[in-house]
C-alpha cells in the first residue's frame, strides 16, 4: 500500500506546524506528501515548503475540500501494482504517531473496506497521559436523513473500542483507496461545506464496499474549518453553520429520493421552510429563521447540480438502500440520544432548579393578605358586572365590535375620520375576549385582581434579588397598595391600573432577557403592553432599554428586539401624528379624555398624581383644628422612610443595584412632572395633560427595589427596617383605602349603558343609528361628537380624535350642522341630519372646569342650546333622561350610514396593518411560550448590580455575604 498524504492548508501558524511535525513522527511514514495551498494567508506557504512535500499545489483561492483533494489526487500517477490510498488531512489535523499505522492495517486486513476513519480528539482539551475528548467517531443518518454523529464530545474511556462498521466517517484523517476515490468521483461538488464526507461514504456503501472506524487511530483537531465545520463561538457563526447544515440535509434528501419523491420534496421546500420557521420561533431560535428560508431557496434553485448528483448515484449504486439499515440509526435511538443530549445541556446550562419557597416563605400568605385588602377596599363593587365613572366606559358592547375597531379604519366619535387605532384598543379586545359573554366584566375582574397581582409581580421580582422572605413581603405590600394604584382604582383610570400591574412583571422578565429568548419575547410583549396602556411611559422605558443594551455586554440581540412589537403597534399612529405635525399627541392617554385638577409638583414628587396627599389633607380637614401641616408631616415622614431605605442601599454591598433603581425612579418622576404640565388632548374644549400616575408607578416600583437593597444591609436583622417600611406604606394607604366607602371614589357599579335607555333600545334594534352628543363648555362653546349605535366605549375611544385640533372637510360640515342645532337663528338641519343617519340629539350636563366648578359661560351656553333644540321643528322632544335632555329625529333611514363609511375606503391599508401586527405578535408569542428550549449561549456579562445565579425564578443570594439560611 502506498499512502499519499494530502495536506490542505488555508492559513499558517502553530496548528499547521503541529500537523507537519506529527506527520514526521508517524511510525508508518507516508510515502508521498502533497501540500495544497487552499487560498492560504500568512506564513502557510513557507511552512508547507519546510515540510518538503513532493508537490505544493495552489488553488488560487479558497475552494471546497473535495476540489482541493481532487487536484492533489490527479497529480499522483496511478500504479497498476500498488494499491494507492489517499490520507486527507487539514492544517489542524495532528495525527498521533501510530494513527497511520492503524489505519493502513485496517485496510490491509479488510479488502472490502474502502474508507477508514480515526477517532477525532479535541486538541484544545487534550493532555498527554489523560483520556481525550472524542469530537467525532463515525456518522450515521436518521430515518429522516439528518446527520447524526455516533460519538460527540465524550470522554474516551475505551467504551467505543469495539466499533467497526459504520455508515460514514468524517473527512478529517480519512484514509480512502485512490481507486474508489477516482471511480466514485470524490466528494460531491453540490456539498461544498457540510456532509461531503458523509455523502461520499454513503455512495461507497451503496457501491457494495465497507466504511470502518479504527478505534486505535487518533487524529487531533482544533476546529479550524478546513476538513469540517469550524468551531463556532459567535451567534453569527452559529446561524451560518445552521444554514449550511440545513442546506446539505435538503440537498441530500433531493439526491437520495426515489421515483416521484424529488418532485414532491421540491414543491414542499419553501412551504415546509415556512412551517419550520414558526417551529424555530417556538423553540426560541429566531436567529435560525433566515437560515431555514435561505437553505430551502438555495436547494430549490440547484436543480442542475441535484440532477448530476442523482445521475452519478444511479450509475454507482450496486446494492439497495435496505442494505444500509444495519448502519443507520432507528427512530427510537435518535429520540433517546436527543433526550439525553437535551437533559445534559439543561443541567450544564441551568444547573439544579431551586424552590422559590413561595408557600413556605410566606409568599402565598402575602398574596392572600393583599387579596383580602382588595376585597375590603372594593367591597362596594362586589356583585357588579360592569363599572363606570372617571375614564371608565364599557369595554365594548360586543366582542365582534371591539375586534372590528382594532388596527385601522373609521374612528368613532368624529365625522369622516379614517385613521389607525390606538394600541390600547388591541389590549382591550384581548382582555375582553377573556370574558367574551360580557366584555365589560373584565374591567371588574381587573379592578379586583390589581392589588394582589401587582403585589405578586413585586414579590417575584424581589425573589430574583434576595432570599429574605420579609424583604419580599415588604416589596409586595409596597407595590400592591401603592398610592398611585389606589388612586387609579378610585379615579377610574384603566390604563394606569393595567400599567401598574404590568410594570413589576416587565422588569422581572427584563432581568432574564439577556439569557433567554423566551424572557426577551415576554419582555417585548410586556413592553408593548405597558406603552399601549400608558404611552407617556415610552420615553422613560426607552431610556431604560438603551441603558440595558449598553450595559449587557457582548450579546445584545435579545435586548435589541424588545421594542419591536411596540414599534409595530404604534407605527401607523406615529406616522399619522407626525404627518399632522402633532408628535406630542403620541404621549396622550388612551381612552376617554378626563380633565382632573392640577396637582402641585411637590405633591407629584411625593408620589401623588392628584391633589390632597392621597387623602391625608381631607382627613386633616375634618379635624377640629384642620391640621394640614400635621398631615403633610405624616406623609413626608412615611415617604421619607422609604426614601431613606433606598439611600441606604447606595452603601450596601450591592450599591450598583440601588443606583440603577434610583436612576429609574428619577426617570419616572421626570415623566410624571413633565406630562402633568403638557396638554396633549382635549376634553371638549379643555386642554388636558396625560395622567402623571403612570410615571409615578414606575418611580415607586424603582424606589421600592432600591429600598429592598437598603433593608438587606442588616441581613438577618432586616426584619426591623422591613416592618418599619411596611408601616410607612400602610400609613400612606389608609385614607385611600376608605375612598370607596366615604364617597371619594368616582367608580361605581355600572349597567353597560352609555346612552339613555330609549336610545339604547333603538340602537339594539338598529346598530347603525347615530346620536349627536352636545355638551356646553367652560368657555361658552358647545362640543359635539357623533356616536354610533349604543354609544362610545373604551375600545372606540381614539387619541387621534381627542388630540386633533385641525378640522377635515367632513368634520367642518358636521361642525356647521351642530352649530345650527344649538343656534336659534340656524336652520333646523332636518335634511342634513337625515343624510347623516342621525336619529337622536342628546344634550348632556355642562362640562366642568378641572376644579369641578361649572362656569357661568357654560350654563349660559347650555341654556341657549336647549332653547334652540326645543324650538327646532324638525326634532321631537323625548324628555329628560339620566344622561341629559333627549330629542328624536323622526323617520331616519340609518342605512345611509353604511354608504357614508364604506369599509372599502379603509382597504388595503387596514388589511396590511392588521396582518403585519398580527404576524409580529404571533411570532413574539411563539418565542415567549415556555417550551423548555435551551439557550444556545449565555452572555459574557450581565447588567451590573442585577446579577443572578440561576435561570429559573429561584431565590438568589445577590446581596453579597448574606449566606445564612433564608428566614424572616
How would you label these PLM feature ranges?
Residues 21-30:
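Short, acidic, metal-binding catalytic loop of nucleotide-sugar glycosyltransferases
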Residues 97-141:
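Conserved donor NDP-sugar-binding/catalytic core segment of glycosyltransferases
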Residues 206-301:
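Active-site-adjacent helix/loop segment of glycosyltransferases
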Residues 218, 451-464, 470-553, 558-576, ...:
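Membrane-embedded helix bundles of polyisoprenyl
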Residues 379-504, 509:
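Active-site lumenal/periplasmic loops and adjacent helix-entry segments of GT-C-fold
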Residues 389-398, 412, 416, 485-497, ...:
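Membrane-helix boundary/interfacial segments in multi-pass membrane proteins
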Residues 408-411, 563, 567-653, 753-754, ...:
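Periplasmic/ER-lumenal interhelical loops and adjacent helix-loop junctions
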Residues 591, 731-968:
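Extracytoplasmic
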